[in-house]
């Protein structure tokens, strides 16, 4: 019962969509209405408002970190922490407060990993940064980081046959699944690069007047 309650609370925390909230607070259009239509930091960046994108990134990462930190703060066993990690991540993907139209989970997963093991989170984030820097594709960076996260967990930290290790693997699989459309675009050479605002403009612009 305790695990179920903790997972439910984590899911509700994950359901808070900072992309939508920050955009509304700053007078920007709903990120689900332009660009990739994904309520995440990369799409918010297409609005041209870097501050909004940074706030979205930090907020989404923080909620992932917070849920796992709370589980550990209250002394919950690893199996409970694992379910909390998955629940907050799923909450971001399918938020009950926003008609289950969520993001792809990159920032939230990073927050979860930082809470699970700070070095694991940093190693995964560094992987994302390196790929993003050289290739300028957020989706490609996310996919590579998702593949390497469980590898880092097993081979760098020796986490094997542990509920949290399985949670990390589950998040990685879900993250790759959520990027299946991006994979098709990457293969077709049609994926937008980081900072590309063309799609936002073509879809009516991201500045002002958007309804949430």
Swiss-Prot record:
It catalyses: an acyl phosphate + sn-glycerol 3-phosphate = a 1-acyl-sn-glycero-3-phosphate + phosphate. One of its GO terms (molecular function) is acyl-phosphate glycerol-3-phosphate acyltransferase activity. Its EC number is 2.3.1.275. Catalyzes the transfer of an acyl group from acyl-phosphate (acyl-PO(4)) to glycerol-3-phosphate (G3P) to form lysophosphatidic acid (LPA). This enzyme utilizes acyl-phosphate as fatty acyl donor, but not acyl-CoA or acyl-ACP. This is Glycerol-3-phosphate acyltransferase. It comes from the Bacteria. One of its GO terms (biological process) is phospholipid biosynthetic process. It is found in: Cell inner membrane. The keyword Transmembrane applies. Probably interacts with PlsX. Belongs to the PlsY family. It is a multi-pass membrane protein. The chain crosses the membrane at residues 3-23, 51-71, 78-98, 115-135, 139-159. InterPro entries: G3P_acylTferase_PlsY. GO terms for cellular component: plasma membrane. Keywords: Cell inner membrane, Cell membrane, Lipid biosynthesis, Lipid metabolism, Membrane, Phospholipid biosynthesis, Phospholipid metabolism, Transferase, Transmembrane, Transmembrane helix. Pathway: Lipid metabolism; phospholipid metabolism. It is an enzyme of class 2 (transferase). Its main location: membrane.
